[in-house]
Amino acid sequence: LSAPPPLEIDLQIEPDGDGVRLTDGDTLVAVANLSEPLPRPSGTPVTFAEARAVGSAYEGLTEHPFSTCFSCGTAREDGLGLRPAAVGDDTGAYAAAWVPREVSVPIGWAALDCPGGWSAGIAGRPMVLGTMTAQLFALPEVGQECVVMAWPGASSGRRFESSSALYGPSGELLGAARAVWIAVNPAAVRPVGR
């Protein structure tokens, strides 16, 4: 991402070598390229019941820097409603219970997005997604009990890394992602010209 994507307006998609560029007029919003396959996560998912239970400790319930976020926002009824919270293990893992109301590739990516940010420490240090590399192996079915796991990675200055994984009701891996998050002032982060 190069700029916060404006919502509910048409953006332009332009070919760019082996990838595409997403623009809003003259403003570059995002670039997408193919990447090498991601390694399979080595962590073990918690159960759906365990993920649901830790959701009551979701830090975004008391203070959320972006409460209208589609994935994890608390002021968004049409969103995914993810409530990622620490599972209390020695890996720093976070988990979120998720029962999809609709399923698509963009929804799968959205499910893999924010849990990584919360595991990287977004509470008390607002961050936005800088880059995300994701791979979906399969999509869940509407109504299935899924778990999204996330783990913090390295950090340097304002840059924080995370990884996340989406698991189906039997613990099967449905998708994985790696992300870079950038610490920001949330009052200064908004779509250009809006």
Report each predicted region and the residues it spans:
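Accessory, usually C-terminal, subdomains that scaffold auxiliary metal cofactors
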Residues: A134-G193
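Non-catalytic linker/capping segments at the edges of enzyme domains
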Residues: D16-V103, R194
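A generic structural signal for well-ordered coil/turn residues at beta-strand boundaries
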Residues: G92-Y94, G130, G175
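Hydrophobic beta-strand-centered segment that forms part of the acyl-chain substrate-binding groove
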Residues: L1-D16, G108-W109, D113-V148, P152, ...
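A short, polar/proline- and glycine-enriched secondary-structure boundary/capping micro-motif
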Residues: V31-N33, V105-G108, P186-A188
